[in-house]
């Protein structure tokens, strides 16, 4: 049943306007369609940020304990939908079954870890030293709206990891998944909403690079969490630096293709095993 299920990824608050519909095919069989991606229009991006900004103060006031409960509820729902996630990780992202299992485990771990951090850092004030006998308290709060952009090689774990951190801290999130793997992201966002996280607080904005450019250049964005190429991260950094508005946070995880060095002491069978794993594990990464 899951092998033939057709999935859809679309903006959280989709308008009635026509937009591009892109097929999402299996990376190992480009004739097999897994689902479709409905791209986010420019004005829908602007509206999404407006909604996220409007609800952020209330989400922040909710407090760390209540936000933690919602993140834990999302983790529970992720586990209840294990079959859906494992199927999508294999069909949409081309992962092996073992990689799909590890991906889901990491996503659940992220949700539970940041739930604990919400309790630890955002539930009660931190008592600071009072050199002259005064009482000093430090309360941590969210900064505003965060844009989260994730890659295709970890379409669930990284997609949910940075939004979970932002949500735990009292920020709201507009999230753009990789254009190749939006279906996994759409399921993750839907389950977060079912867990009780407001739709305005965590919004999905599928699409190509143009969507990413908009959510990293808007002056209302308080921060960007990006995983991808170093070149793109540098472009985002320049965009944030050149815009009018408060200084934004940039969290960038970037990298490249590593080499494999084999010396004369290596066992041939070990080299073969490791080369095969590097070629096919983690969606070919």
Question: In which residue ranges do the predicted regions lie?
Answer:
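Conserved small-residue-rich beta-alpha loop and adjacent elements
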Residues: 124-199, 269
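Terminal low-complexity tails and localization/encapsulation signals of metabolic enzymes
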Residues: 1-50, 54-57, 61-76, 87, ...
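Short beta->alpha connector loops at strand-helix junctions that form conserved
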Residues: 176-178, 206, 263-264
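Extended, amphipathic, non-transmembrane alpha-helical segments
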Residues: 79-85
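Hydrophobic packing residues within well-ordered alpha-helices of enzyme cores
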Residues: 111, 185-188, 215, 236-237
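A structured beta-alpha segment of the ubiquitous adenosine-cofactor-binding alpha/beta core
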Residues: 135-137, 203-225
